[in-house]
Amino acid sequence: MCVIDRSSTIQTRRLTLRAPANPDAARIGALAGDYAIAKMTTRMPWPYSQGDADGFVARCQVQDRRRDSTFVIELQDEGVVGVLGFFTPSDGHLEIGYWLGRPYWSRGLATEAVQGALAWAKSDWRKKLVVAGHFVDNPASGQVLIKAGFLYTGVVEPKASTARGETVATRMMVWLA
């Protein structure tokens, strides 16, 4: 496995994915302060404060890039619109997660970001398998993953949602290069 350079960027038709920097925290905080976003993630707290955003960016800057890599998603002429990350849980299978600010939903941006990130993971990180999941009450995320080439595994796992404070049924998916 290669070590991921902090300067790694992914370019797609409309997006640039790059490592979060300190100035991004204000925009992340503004977008992530929406319960509709937080409740569809496993890790995002609610309410989401500026301190949470600052801490998130600081943690991203010290990630073990042999196992994990987080990107802000920038839309041309609009700046940061969301976050995408790869992380390696204890089972060892690389997992992808993402979120977009509500003004950027239903524009194909999540699909474009995930597709670009998967191409990068395959070419730069030499990954041939990536897993993902979406809460059963978030079928739109499932559609993003299907469009990016993921398939349902048939497994539904309980996953904790920090924002909800409860476990949520999660449909698991896999992408094979």
Regions found by a protein language model. Name each.
Residues 1-35, 72-177:
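Acyl-donor (CoA/ACP) binding surface of acyl/acetyltransferases
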Residues 22, 47-50, 67:
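Generic alpha-helical scaffold signal
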Residues 32, 41, 64-65:
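Hydrophobic residues in alpha-helical segments
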Residues 36-59:
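Conserved GNAT-fold acetyl-CoA-binding loop/helix
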Residues 58-72:
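A short helix-loop-beta-strand connector motif used in the catalytic cores of GNAT acetyltransferases and
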